[in-house]
Amino acid sequence: MGNCVKSPLRNLSRKMRQEEKTSYMAVQTSEDGLADGGELHGPLMMLAQNCAVMHNLLGPACIFLRKGFAENRQPDRSLRPEEIEELREAFREFDKDKDGYINCRDLGNCMRTMGYMPTEMELIELSQQINMNLGGHVDFDDFVELMGPKLLAETADMIGVKELRDAFREFDTNGDGEISTSELREAMRKLLGHQVGHRDIEEIIRDVDLNGDGRVDFEEFVRMMSR
């Protein structure tokens, strides 16, 4: 897991480090996923268990890793139906005009949505491959050809789009497709068992709010989770 914390969040991270052990033990020992400050269940419980150091989540610097599957993965096998569906769901998320294609610019974000964290060099190589061979656009079959081997090799260490989407819905309590400051504050209260200050929440949102609207959409959430 990455442990680098962006500077606007350093002070908050320091405070959270002091309480991470207590917060994590509360999550681990609660049978129904309740923390002191409120209800914690489902995707939020999964996030908490996969990121014991809570300041990494707020960093935002946590790459969430699935545990326990590496021994069962066989890179030379075919994709399973559920893995094809995961690819399809990720592809749909970034096929914004619903024409059956995504462009090379969106491919990096799409890969991050799947939990695969490409290096800058990998993205350059993929971009060159797409522009030269695929006309700058990728249909679903091309996407499977590009991402299938990566999914087979990396899925043991990744959190997928379904888990990210489920976690996003837990934060987005009113279902409007964006996380507001109040929604993020409430999610952090549930995760940590105490209230996070308004200024700290605003700093978190400013750090990941790419379009400057003061809210976090799903694409920004994916970036937040993958830094």
From Swiss-Prot:
Residues 82-117, 136-153, 159-194, 196-227 form the EF-hand domain. The modification Phosphoserine is found at S180. The keyword Disulfide bond does not apply. One of its GO terms (biological process) is negative regulation of protein import into nucleus. PROSITE patterns: EF_HAND_1, EF_HAND_2. Signal peptide: none annotated. Keywords: Calcium, Lipoprotein, Metal-binding, Myristate, Palmitate, Phosphoprotein, Repeat, Sensory transduction, Vision. Expressed in the inner retina, specifically in amacrine cells and in cone OFF-bipolar cells (at protein level). The keyword Repeat applies. A lipid is attached at C4 (S-palmitoyl cysteine). EF-1 binds magnesium constitutively under physiological conditions, EF-3 and EF-4 bind calcium cooperatively and EF-2 binds neither calcium nor magnesium. Modulates calcium-dependent activity of inositol 1,4,5-triphosphate receptors (ITPRs). Inhibits agonist-induced intracellular calcium signaling. Enhances inactivation and does not support calcium-dependent facilitation of voltage-dependent P/Q-type calcium channels. Causes calcium-dependent facilitation and inhibits inactivation of L-type calcium channels by binding to the same sites as calmodulin in the C-terminal domain of CACNA1C, but has an opposite effect on channel function. Suppresses the calcium-dependent inactivation of CACNA1D. Inhibits TRPC5 channels. This is Calcium-binding protein 1. It comes from Mus musculus. The lineage of its organism: Eukaryota, Metazoa, Chordata, Craniata, Vertebrata.
